[in-house]
Amino acid sequence: MTINQISVFLENKPGQLAEFTRLLEEKQIDMRALSIAETQNFGILRLITDDPYKTVNVVKEAGYVCSVTPVLAVALSDKPGSLVKLLTALGEGNINVEYTYAFIARKKDLAYMVFQVDNPEKAMQIL
């Protein structure tokens, strides 16, 4: 399934992530997944929420720079070898995984992963 990921630029200094997540709490936005890629001066927060459109509006109104990217959300059996099977299938289909991170779920026996790939349509066919 394709979902919308929000990428937000945060200053790389103490308290910035707490301030940002407090904003989401105040606006009753529930985070489902997050990942941070950092550089010396700023971080890129990749975020999945329960309402991406509301999130973008709230984030922009608060003065943050953000963008929206479609990514794949994939459910895997929560057992050894599930991820390697998926990655092997993508590799054999010549799909490059640009990054991935875990997704918080409430279903038993399943693990969810978010994938940014170079060809989402083809990846969906493979999966």
Task: Give a label for each model feature.
Residues 1-127:
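A conserved regulatory-domain signal marking ACT and ACT-like small-molecule sensing domains
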